[in-house]
UniProtKB/Swiss-Prot annotation:
Residues 53-360 are annotated as: 15 X 20 AA approximate tandem repeats of P-P-G-K-P-Q-G-P-P-P-Q-G-[GD]-[NKS]-[KSQ]-[PRS]-[QRS] [GPS]-[PSAR]-[PSR]. Residues 34-47, 290-300 have a biased composition (Low complexity). Sequence repeats lie at residues 53-72, 74-93, 94-113, 114-133, 135-154, 155-174, 176-195, 197-216, 217-236, 238-257, 259-278, 279-298, 300-319, 321-340, 341-360. The gene is PRB2. It is found in: Secreted. This is Basic salivary proline-rich protein 2. Peptides IB-9 and P-E are the same peptide. N- and O-glycosylated. In head and neck cancer patients, O-glycosylated with glucosylgalactosyl carbohydrate moiety. This modification would require prior hydroxylation on the lysine residue. Proteolytically cleaved at the tripeptide Xaa-Pro-Gln, where Xaa in the P(3) position is mostly lysine. The endoprotease may be of microbial origin. Residues 1-16 form the signal peptide. Residues 19-28 have a biased composition (Polar residues).
Length: 416
């Protein structure tokens, strides 16, 4: 993330400085005197590149493509190169600070970067990708990549995981202003990446999976949202702390992260739906991957959360209220429902299964991992809904090793 942002900033600065003297004012007559502008659009059909307002140098505008439009950013700081290639790319940048290179591909729209800090490169490739720009404050990473109609609006003020990477109509969740955002969508059909609000950096969004939904509560950081295929929505990560990388590979492994405070052993890799909720006060491992309609639970503000679910079919996971970190959302299982009672920790919500909803964890304490796989198992705490299983998370203050992988149809309960 940092390397990408740094590289984008360096490219924008270097291109702006190199093009300051090379670009003649004949190509940009509307350019205000005293402020250099990047090179206007080159090649393509009907390229439009309105000049940037006075203030700082601008990178080169869109090149090639059919009817690319790249309005220059308002005065303030240099802007990276606008969209290149593609059909009808539009990327008007807001005034203020430098922006990374806009979208490249077909009908891609680069999200506007609000003034304040540099923005990462916008979506590349794909059909009709849309990436609304982030609010002013800090740089934004690249928007969603691939995926089918993923949606993930993030809450303003704090960092969010990387937006969904899917195939069609993927929308990256907004990262609140103030901090950098992950890389925008690349490829795919009709990806949309609404920009994050100012505040903190956003991690990479969900990849793969069908119709994952996981809106996080504002106030604290959330791990990377679900990565699924169709209509995946990355859960919003509330502002607060950094987010870990989302799970990759394995067969729907669950490794609920430990509460912030102390280190945790390596989370489960491979295997069948292993479950292991971590105690509060310590760092959290990567969240669930796969599952049907699993929604990643929101991580309350204040502590970091592991990465959310990736893949799976239509994962749904309502996020927990703010207060303490929550384990990974549900994986596996058939329609598990188990909202935990407020005030106590709840394990990671169910992962996988059909139309499973992870119970929200009330603010105050972390939540242990809920059901994983099996048919409607019942755990100890939750009063509400269905036959959910919710094992209690271990007390805070002690490190937790890797969770035990379950053997057989029923999920293993985490250590207390």
């Amino acid at each position: 993330m940092l390397l990408i942002l740094l590289s984008v900033a360096l490219l924008a600065l270097s291109s702006a400085q190199n093009l300051n003297e090379d670009v003649s004012q004949e190509e940009s007559p509307s350019l205000i005197a005293g402020n250099p502008q990047g090179a206007p659009p080159q090649g393509g059909n009907k390229p439009q590149g309105p000049p940037s307002p006075p203030g700082k140098p601008q990178g080169p505008p869109p090149q090639g493509g059919n009817q690319p439009q790249g309005p220059p950013p308002p005065p303030g700081k240099p802007q990276g190169p606008p969209p290149q290639g593609g059909n009808k790319p539009q990327g008007p940048p807001p005034p203020g600070k430098p922006q990374g290179p806009p979208p490249q591909g077909d009908k891609s729209r680069s999200p506007r970067s609000p003034p304040g800090k540099p923005q990462g490169p916008p979506p590349q490739g794909g059909n009709q990708p849309q990436g609304p720009p982030p609010p002013p404050g800090k740089p934004q990473g690249p928007p969603p990549q691939g995926g089918n109609k993923p949606q993930g609006p993030p809450p303003p003020g704090k960092p969010q995981g990387p937006p969904p990477q899917g195939d069609n109509k993927s929308r990256s969740s907004r990262s609140p202003p103030g901090k950098p955002q992950g890389p925008p969508p690349q490829g795919g059909n009709q990806p949309q990446g609404p920009p994050p609000p100012p505040g903190k950096p956003q991690g990479p969004p969900p990849q793969g999976g069908n119709k994952p939904q996981g809106p996080p509560p504002p106030g604290k950081p959330q791990g990377p949202p679900p990565q699924g295929d169709n209509k995946s929505q990355s859960a919003r990560s509330p502002p607060g702390k950094p987010q870990g990388p989302p799970p990759q590979g394995g067969n729907q492994p669950q490794g609920p992260p430990p509460p912030p405070g102390k280190p945790q052993g390596p989370p489960p890799q491979g295997g069948n739906k292993p479950q292991g909720p971590p105690p509060p006060g310590k760092p959290q491992g990567p969240p669930p991957q796969g599952g049907s309609k699993s929604r990643s639970s929101r991580s309350p503000p204040g502590k970091p959360q592991g990465p959310p679910p990736q893949g799976g079919n239509q994962p749904q996971g309502p996020p927990p209220p703010p207060g303490k970190p929550q384990g990974p959302p549900p994986q596996g299982g058939n329609k598990p429902q188990g909202p935990p009672p407020p005030g106590k920790p709840q394990g990671p919500p169910p992962q996988g299964g059909s139309k499973s909803r992870s119970a929200r964890s009330p603010p105050g304490k972390p939540q242990g991992p809920p059901q994983q796989e099996g048919n409607n198992p019942q755990g100890p705490p939750p009063p509400a809904g269905g036959n959910p299983q919710q094992p209690q998370a271990p007390p805070a203050g002690q490190p937790q090793g890797p969770p035990r992988p379950p053997q057989g149809g029923r999920p293993s309960r985490p250590p207390q």
